[in-house]
Regions:
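HotDog/MaoC-like acyl-thioester-processing domains
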Residues: 14, 77-83, 88-120
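Hydrophobic residues on conserved beta-strands that form the core of alpha/beta folds
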Residues: 2-3, 64-67, 97, 111
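Catalytic strand-loop segment that frames the active site of acyl-thioester-processing enzymes
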Residues: 1-32
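Compact, glycine-rich, soluble single-domain proteins
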Residues: 28-47, 61-65
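Short amphipathic alpha-helical segments enriched in hydrophobics
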Residues: 9, 23, 44-51
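Hydrophobic beta-strand-centered segment that forms part of the acyl-chain substrate-binding groove
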Residues: 46-83
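A residue-level detector for short acidic-glycine micro-motifs
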Residues: 4-7, 69, 74, 88-90, ...
Length: 120
């Protein structure tokens, strides 16, 4: 649930998503908290997909092992554009720890840390 992958480097990945009224997670003119979580998860998936595609490998399935410190200051309105930034904190074996920040313009609306395990 992203529109564009706009930046990738080994530490940072950035995506955008315009909230649409027909989004499955949109209700009463807002994207739900679950929708914000899904956007973060899909940004992580886009990162891994891009890495796999660029290296000619197959895409591995990622499983979220933990979400910690999740905070939302507000839910975005239909029509607003989310910018989601994933910063890699640590990668050990098949486990990646990331910090996610979701903004609308310059306003931070959500932050969390995730632990993602890759399956072979």
């Amino acid at each position: 649930m992203i529109d564009r992958l706009i930046h990738y480097d080994p530490v940072r990945t950035v995506t955008t998503l315009q909230v649409r009224a027909d989004n499955i997670f949109a209700d009463d003119g807002h994207l739900s908290v679950a929708g914000i979580n899904e956007n973060i998860a899909q940004t992580c998936a886009a990162r891994m997909g891009y890495i796999s595609h660029s290296s000619g490998g197959r895409v591995k399935i990622g499983v979220i092992g933990a979400i910690t410190g999740f905070s939302v200051t507000r839910t975005p309105l239909v029509g607003e554009v989310l910018t989601t930034t994933i910063d890699v904190i640590q990668e050990v074996f098949q486990v990646t720890l990331v910090h996610a920040t979701v903004t609308v313009g310059t306003e931070v609306i959500a932050e969390t840390d995730l632990k993602i395990a890759l399956q072979d």
